[in-house]
Amino acid sequence: MSTPSKKRLIRDFKRLSTDPPGGISGAPCADNLMIWNAVIFGPADTPFEDGTFKLVLTFDESYPNKPPTVKFLSKMFHPNVYANGELCLDILQNRWSPTYDVAAILTSIQSLLHDPNPNSPANAEAASLYRENMKEYVRRVKATVEASWLDDGEMPESIEEDDEAEAEAEAEATVDRSAPQTASA
């Protein structure tokens, strides 16, 4: 049975597949629509340029009324990323809005790579270096970028492009078989 959160995630996936913002990609796991794998490419003209950073987004049935949990799987050195990969990002906390979709979340994270907020640090060392020793901060970030190229951390199996049509058809069939349709945000 398809729930409002799953219907919304299907819509988010269709949008992300047909009109992806530059430098990001994401898809639900093949066996669980509520867990997504994503990749953010480091923004140009930043120390993160050329990096390939893996993330996992975990949704629950309260989405889109509550934000997903988002965590970098790739090692990060950033003022707003905790050692465990979780983010300190206002839209994932007190500034969340149900109008945000997966593309908006990933774009916001990419923007955070471009413009860190050292005044709200999750990583005090990175924030301190960002403010006081940019040369060392950049050196540490570039080491993270290089590590992202070698990152062979396994991510759960995602829907591949060839399987997208099949997954969409299956998802739509689930939606079509569900109880009476109601409009949802």
UniProtKB/Swiss-Prot annotation:
Domain of life per record: Eukaryota
Annotated region (Disordered), positions in chain: 149-185
Pfam family, one: UQ_con
Subcellular location: Cytoplasm; Nucleus
GO CC annotation, single: nucleus
Keywords from the named record: ATP-binding, Chromatin regulator, Cytoplasm, DNA damage, DNA repair, Nucleotide-binding, Nucleus, Sporulation, Transcription, Transcription regulation, Transferase, Ubl conjugation pathway
Keyword Secreted: no
GO molecular function, one term: single-stranded DNA helicase activity
Main location (coarse class): cytoplasm
Residues annotated as catalytic: 88
Comp. bias intervals (Acidic residues): 149-173
GO biological process, alphabetically ordered: cellular response to unfolded protein; cytoplasm protein quality control by the ubiquitin-proteasome system; DNA repair; DNA-templated transcription termination; double-strand break repair via homologous recombination; ERAD pathway; error-free postreplication DNA repair; error-free translesion synthesis
Enzyme class, UniProt record, top EC level: transferase
EC number: 2.3.2.23
Keyword S-adenosyl-L-methionine found: no
Pathway noted in the entry: Protein modification; protein ubiquitination
UniProt catalytic activity: S-ubiquitinyl-[E1 ubiquitin-activating enzyme]-L-cysteine + [E2 ubiquitin-conjugating enzyme]-L-cysteine = [E1 ubiquitin-activating enzyme]-L-cysteine + S-ubiquitinyl-[E2 ubiquitin-conjugating enzyme]-L-cysteine
Domain annotation UBC core: ranges: 4-150
Task of the protein: Catalyzes the covalent attachment of ubiquitin to other proteins. Plays a role in transcription regulation by catalyzing the monoubiquitination of histone H2B to form H2BK123ub1. H2BK123ub1 gives a specific tag for epigenetic transcriptional activation and is also a prerequisite for H3K4me and H3K79me formation. Also involved in postreplication repair of UV-damaged DNA, in N-end rule-dependent protein degradation and in sporulation.
PANTHER family found in the cross-reference section: UBIQUITIN-CONJUGATING ENZYME E2 (PTHR24067)
Family: Belongs to the ubiquitin-conjugating enzyme family.
Name of the featured protein: Ubiquitin-conjugating enzyme E2 2
Encoding gene per record: UBC2
